């Protein structure tokens, strides 16, 4: 990504969007260089031409839902039928937000500076452990601020609702598409 003259932050976002496969990164960088034709790198412009990984698209859609911008999310789900991917991602995001909110209710204050946050995260990393793995601090850092749009109790009940919806879809009690659509409506109804 240094060939494009991008900031470290934009380089990280670009890798997050296109994936970590070195061959794909090389191809995407070539495509971007040709597209820019010597102009400055602008991430929003580049997003239009890169081949974005499905996981990143789901992450973006979930972020839209959690920030109360659901029209794009509903369109995405209608086109792609990625209901379970979005459900699993919502579950993970809401669970992490609940943990952040709980720590803040206990008086913990997280820095808005990433380098300071990384050091703070070491103290709480076990709390965020999922399936035996500690997430990268940046993954948790990106959730800071979004959790403020929900009460701690709402986050707790939404985490439980995600689990219920997944269980009921898997046991055949609920139909996938309307169940996830209704869950999204529940989430936005809790938005402050």
Where do the protein language model's features map onto the residues?
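C-terminal alpha-helical interaction modules of replication/initiation AAA+ assemblies
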Residues: 57-66, 70-192
């Amino acid at each position: 990504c240094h060939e494009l003259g991008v900031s470290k932050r934009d380089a990280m976002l670009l890798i997050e969007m296109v994936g970590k496969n070195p061959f794909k990164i090389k191809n995407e960088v070539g495509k971007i260089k040709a597209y820019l034709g010597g102009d400055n790198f602008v991430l929003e412009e580049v997003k239009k031409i890169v081949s974005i990984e499905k996981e990143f698209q789901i992450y973006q859609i979930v972020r839209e839902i959690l920030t109360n911008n659901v029209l794009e999310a509903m369109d995405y789900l209608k086109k792609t039928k990625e209901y379970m991917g979005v459900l699993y991602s919502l579950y993970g995001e809401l669970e992490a937000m609940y943990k952040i909110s709980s720590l803040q209710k206990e008086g913990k204050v997280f820095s808005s500076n990433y380098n300071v946050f990384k050091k703070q995260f070491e103290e709480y990393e076990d709390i965020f452990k999922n399936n035996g793995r500690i997430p990268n601090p940046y993954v948790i850092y990106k959730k800071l601020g979004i959790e403020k749009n929900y009460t701690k109790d709402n986050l707790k009940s939404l985490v439980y609702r995600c689990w219920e919806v997944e269980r009921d879809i898997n046991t055949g009690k609920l139909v996938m598409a309307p169940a996830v659509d209704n869950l999204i409506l529940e989430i936005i109804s809790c938005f402050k």
